Amino acid sequence: MNNRHIYVLSAVLAVLSLALFVYKARVLGFPVNPQEETQIWNVEAALSFDPGPTAVKATLRIPGLTPGFAILDENFVSRGFGLTTRNAPAGREAQWALRQASGRQTLYYRALIYRDETRIAEDTTPPFPAPPILDEPSRAALEGLIAEVRRQSADVSSFTTELLRHINQAENDPYASLFLKRGSTVAERAQLATVFLAGAQIPARVAHGITLRNEAGRVEADPLLEVHDGVQWLYFDPRTLEQGLPPDFLIWWRGDQGIASLEGGSSLEVTLAVQQNLLDSMLVAERRAEQAGSHSMDFSLFALPIATQAVYSVLVMIPVGALVIMLLRNFVGVKTFGTFMP
């Protein structure tokens, strides 16, 4: 093998090694610093209810598609209940069932959440919505509102902002006031906006989520309006009209249903809580590689037993030591026995 072949082979190996390093560091999030830690949040949902004399079913909407975040781990805590998880139009659902129960019951869902910006663009493009079925007066009011908002806007983003402004000022709007009752909630106003947007052939849906705070404690779910402009999903706060996905907002479920439902019981209460923690970045990277189906961990030293890892850590240092001795011999003038022996 001549020198040219050696240089080409060395360059190919160097490029492959650098590409693998960048992939692990940028895509899988492998830490470069051994003391590096990742910010995570423990989120918890607790369902409390009184069971009835018949079989009981409790359904909880749980996080599924969470732009900007990913689920590191999740677990369910219950006493004797059967558990199934499934995909639903509102996202993922967990359903507990028990033939017979007595006394007040409490069920828990817990998850570890970490920030993952690669999940923002995972959502799919929705079909055009079907026009809402309304009576003649309501249809005329809807068409009048859409025509007025369209005159005051230039694209989907400005159309949605102007529409939300009309809804929030419904008492002064002759069209929107026909659809809203006095004292309507923010979630009801956001859901009404999806009806108006469907009349304008614009896909929209209501997302519900929580703000991941630094301090531990209970949190309340807030609505967020999602609108598709033909290319991507846009996010709007139906209360403040601000556009964009808040950086610490975790989308929990979507749709016009509540976070939980109960069959065969009464007095259902749901509480949400969040707590911030720090976790070794290596554990998060391993979990991310597992979820992505990457085989990079199959060839990693971390897949070996601890004793074998210790041996390899010593072997890896031998070329470094040889390089140091060579520099000391050739540039400093330290006398050695042979090339690498001090």
Label each PLM-derived region with a short phrase.
Residues 3-119:
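Intrinsically disordered, low-complexity N-terminal segments that are enriched in acidic
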Residues 184-190:
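Gly/Ser-rich catalytic serine loop of serine hydrolases
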Residues 25, 328-334:
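Membrane-interface capping segments at transmembrane-helix boundaries
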Residues 62-64, 111-115, 124-125, 208-211, ...:
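A mature extracytoplasmic/lumenal domain signature
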Residues 332-342:
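Membrane-interfacial loop-to-transmembrane alpha-helix junctions, especially the N-terminal start
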Residues 88-95, 102-184, 199:
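Acidic low-complexity segments
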Residues 239-329:
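Juxtamembrane membrane-insertion context
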Residues 191-266:
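Hydrophobic/aromatic-rich core segments of domains that either
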